[in-house]
Amino acid sequence: MIFPNFIKKNDVIGVTAPSDGNRKEVDFKRLILAEEALQKRGYKVRLTENVKTSENGRSSSAPERGRQLLSLIEDPEVTAITLAKGGDFLMEMLPETDFEKIRQNPKWLQGFSDSTGLLFTVTTCCDIATIYGNHFNEFAMEPWHMTQQYNMDLLEGNFPVQKSFDFYEDDFYDKITGKEPYQKDKEVCWQGTEQDLEITGRMLGGCLDVLLNLVGTRFDNVRAFNQRYGKDGILWFLESFDLNSECLIRGLWQLKEAGWFDSAVGFVFGRPCMYDSAYGFSYQEAVMSVLKQLHLPVIFNADVGH
């Protein structure tokens, strides 16, 4: 596994939009605030053009998204790349992505949600570690939440021991100034299949909604990844955006039968963003209806995802 070089003061952090770009006025405010926050920390920021454009849920055409990502990959001054936003259609740019150039120029890539399509593929196909974390605009909030602090510590090579947060934001809130912090809506309460759990493994995962689009395509390299790293054990971290119980059950079954979980040592599930069930299944019941036969530890409601 290749771990890109950690960033240091005066390095350039690149920002590009392989999914959607920014379109609201408050998002443009957040872009400026996030750039200022990272500059105060000692970094330069370089934005590609599509960070500030959005049409029909896309920052630009698929070939253009591939080109703008590549411009940062090949830029020797850029040492890390933070993706601008999530969305729905990142998968369109995967055929336009030069994965060989990414292999030759390993850099930290980070994002979440629809960004899973790029991050997961880079890790499983190129053997390059990626970060499932903040999109760029999240660095605009004042003061930073520990999420942003942990993120920067990791990029800088200071490996934090991440602990459960006290509260989490349970809804979407409109932003006015762009500096708004997370709302402390509910207390965090992790749950597990056992009272005390200790799991060790190589972490892999992302947004289930997106992973289900990758399975069985030419970008699905998980079986080979399992062969290379199976001896370490794969600790899967998974979260869903708007899968109901029926889609969740079918999706996990599909991944299991496709061999994705052949080297699994356990699972960490984030809190689902939007979830319902036609049959009255809780999220945990839906998950365990598929995974219980694996007899592996599972953690629910972790601080992962939307």
Predicted features by range, described:
Residues T97-T123, A129-N137, Q293-V298:
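Short, acidic/small-residue loops that bind anionic groups at enzyme active sites
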